[in-house]
């Protein structure tokens, strides 16, 4: 019983969190094959815009 309740809790949290922060900026970033990060971009990436309704950064690989 405990395991089934735990799994139900995990599944409900997972499905309720999907697409909560997705806005037009996140969609545009992902369509351009870039990566969204909440904090600074990783070392080999640079910031090209925002994600998560302005709370994150859209990062593109340096070539």
From Swiss-Prot:
Superkingdom of this protein's organism: Eukaryota
Expression tissues: Only expressed in epididymis (caput, corpus and cauda).
GO biological process: defense response to bacterium
Disulfide pairings: 29-58, 36-51, 41-59
Principal location class: secreted
Subcellular location(s) of the protein: Secreted
Pfam family, one: Defensin_beta
InterPro entries assigned to the protein according to its UniProt record, in alphabetical order: Defensin_beta-like
UniProt keyword list: Antibiotic, Antimicrobial, Defensin, Disulfide bond, Secreted, Signal
Listed GO CC annotations: extracellular region
Secreted in keyword set: yes
Residues spanning the signal sequence: 1-21
Function: Synthetic Defb38 kills both Gram-negative (E.coli and P.aeruginosa) and Gram-positive (E.faecium) bacteria.
Family in the record: Belongs to the beta-defensin family.
Protein name: Beta-defensin 38
Gene: Defb38
């Amino acid at each position: 019983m405990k395991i089934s309740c735990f799994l139900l809790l995990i599944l409900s949290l997972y499905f309720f969190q999907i697409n909560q922060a997705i806005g037009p900026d996140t969609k545009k970033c992902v369509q351009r094959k870039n990566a969204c990060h909440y904090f600074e971009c990783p070392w080999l990436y640079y910031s090209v815009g925002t994600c998560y309704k302005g709370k994150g950064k859209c990062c593109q690989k340096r070539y």
